[in-house]
């Protein structure tokens, strides 16, 4: 009976997946059904059931997205990124390859007093390759985090932060400078 149920649920799953309006590459585990139209999810990526991903996103290879994650529209996540519980990424954000997000400032293997610290990446922010974002922080609107930066404090809107620890080196409205 259990094997028959597994076969039936597999067939239902196949029918459901044919009707989706987003792309999932081979060798990807996508447990979430909360994925927006036009989103592309590439190989060797694992998205857990509770994750919510907006429309027109591009999620690279070898990405892991945990349950309590919110990702807005038009977000690009490059290869090798892990996004843990409590991370909220607003619209139009770029996350470079191998960016590391953390959600527990004091991790232990058997931590019963685990405190999830939420992180917010605001609209239009860009995070360079190999940057590390410590938990409980806010990356400001249209801010830029340089490659390899270790962000230990909040980054204000329209700022450039670089280094270890990351420090603000410039403040500007980047979108108005481009136009």
Identify the function of each model-found stretch.
Residues 3-15, 19-20, 26, 30-34, ...:
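Flexible, glycine/small-residue-enriched loop-and-beta-strand segment within the central core
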Residues 26, 149-150:
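General secondary-structure propensity
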Residues 141-144, 150-152:
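Internal alpha/beta core interface subdomains
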Residues 145, 163:
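Conserved G/P- and acidic residue-centered "switch" motifs that form tight phosphate/ATP-binding loops
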Residues 153-154, 165:
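Conserved functional loop/turn residues at catalytic and ligand-binding sites
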Residues 158-160:
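Extracellular disulfide-bonded cysteine-rich modules/repeats
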């Amino acid at each position: 009976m259990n094997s028959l149920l597994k076969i039936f649920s597999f067939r239902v799953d196949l029918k459901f997946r044919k009707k989706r309006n987003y792309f999932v590459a081979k060798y990807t585990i996508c447990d979430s059904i909360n994925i927006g139209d036009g989103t592309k999810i590439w190989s060797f990526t694992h998205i857990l059931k509770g994750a919510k991903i907006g429309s027109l996103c591009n999620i690279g290879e070898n990405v892991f997205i945990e349950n309590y994650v919110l990702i807005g529209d038009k977000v690009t996540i490059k290869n090798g990124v892990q996004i843990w519980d409590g991370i909220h990424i607003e619209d139009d954000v770029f996350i470079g390859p191998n960016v590391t997000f953390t959600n527990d400032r004091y991790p232990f293997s058997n931590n019963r007093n685990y405190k999830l610290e939420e992180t917010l990446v605001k609209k239009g922010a860009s995070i360079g390759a190999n940057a590390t974002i410590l938990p409980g922080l806010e990356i400001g609107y249209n801010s830029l985090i340089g490659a390899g930066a270790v962000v230990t404090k909040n980054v204000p809107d329209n700022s450039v932060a670089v280094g270890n620890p990351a420090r603000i080196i410039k403040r500007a409205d980047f979108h108005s400078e481009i136009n």
